[in-house]
Amino acid sequence: GVELDPVSGRIARQLYQKNKIAIQGFEETDYPDSFFDCVIGNVPFGAYQISDRRYDRHHFLIHDYFIAKSLDLIRPGGVVAVVTSSGTMDKQNPAVRQYLANRAELLGAIRLPNNAFQRNANTGVVSDILFFQKRDRASIEEPDWIHLKETAEGYSVNAYFADHPEMVLGEFTTESTQYGKQEVTVRPKEGITLEEQLKEAVKHIHGTITELELSDTELEEDVVSIPADPEVKNF
């Protein structure tokens, strides 16, 4: 696991003592590509970029950067599941979504209501849970979820949510921002809990993950590996 906050990181180390918890920025980690089977996270949201020479040319906002880097870290067929800003799916410029679609299939997405994190983080932002499965090879296809689309009520949102209203855990509406601009948000439904809605929504997400088979070369490398001689100096 990776946790930037020292307190949260130490708590995680106590909770998961058999696991390695790195207390550092995600951009500072040096995990090899195609190393993990699955990456799960609640990525930071923000309208700012993070410095990483490998990704700087893409000008990713921080939440999009976390998704892109996670996809590189998992093996083909592996799954990335993240909570991210609704901006990943709803921004006007589709470049980030095209980048992700070239590398992964969107298994499904769930749009959360604007009060989902009100209790824990005192924030009313709209967020999504996205599920990606990494492709074996890069694709040039342009799936519908790359684009925006108007809902039946006339709200411009990601085509996935316009076509799958059952994955929106609330009702689309607009609200005024601090600058007086009208912004699309998701008002929570009455008479049903978020937990109940989530249980129903995840039933619509389907995917298959298989165990990675090691190649003959990788098996041979494991066989011939020997420990270093402690008497030999490492210059």
Which residues does each PLM region occupy?
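Short glycine-enriched, charge-decorated loop/helix-capping segments at active-site entrances
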Residues: R53-H58
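A short acidic, often aromatic-flanked loop/helix-cap motif at beta-alpha or helix-coil junctions
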Residues: E28-Y31, N115-R119, T177-Q178
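Conserved Class I SAM-dependent methyltransferase catalytic core
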Residues: V2-I11, H59-Q118, V125-F132
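Flexible, glycine-/basic-rich loop-and-beta segments that form/coincide
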Residues: R119-E220
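Flexible loop residues that form catalytic
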Residues: P44, N114, R135
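Conserved S-adenosyl-L-methionine
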Residues: G1-G41, G46-Y48, F60, S85-S86, ...
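Hydrophobic/aromatic interaction determinants used to assemble and anchor large protein complexes
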Residues: I11, A228-F235
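Short catalytic/ligand-binding loop motif for oxyanion handling, primarily in non-cytosolic enzymes
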Residues: A47-I50, M89-Q92, I140
